[in-house]
Amino acid sequence: MSSSALSSSALSSSAPSGASPAPSPSPPGGRAVGRTDPCRIVELPEYTDPRGTLTVVECGSEIDFDIKRAYHIRDVPDGRRRGAHGHRRLRQLIIAVHGSFEVIVDDGFERDRFLLDDPGRGLYVGPMIWRDMVGFAPGTVGLWLVSEPYDEAEYYRDYDAFLHDARAAS
């Protein structure tokens, strides 16, 4: 299994449609995306024996929030994008349970992308982060563990409104 990677490649072509120009990606060794609660890869404990591998996520250990909702995404058509939104309060751990995809994160100032391709690693994404999921390999299954029940009022669906609030909060 390959490991998850972080890349600082230019992302201007990945800006949400109709959105303002994308912020510059952070330079190597630069500040992580997420001004107060940085996005980060979380290593998940794995236990392997002749019966297979068990991967664990515990509240208070691997993640510092209670899981109030979980969902998975699968069967994403080739070339399609998921996400294209931000959250006001919600925190989440995103895991590629099978296959791979990239998550582009944007806090209104910095932008980066994470490749998720190992079920033993997840991406923590905190509040006030715009996210896009792209590059789904055939057969990919992604799992989201989230801190809040679904509430449409908690979402940013408009990138310019997200940018306004994200930049005003800093």
Predicted ranges, named:
Residues D118-L123, M128-G135:
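Well-ordered alpha/beta subsegment
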Residues M1-A5, G18-R121, P138-V141, L145, ...:
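Non-catalytic, conserved peripheral segments adjacent to functional cores
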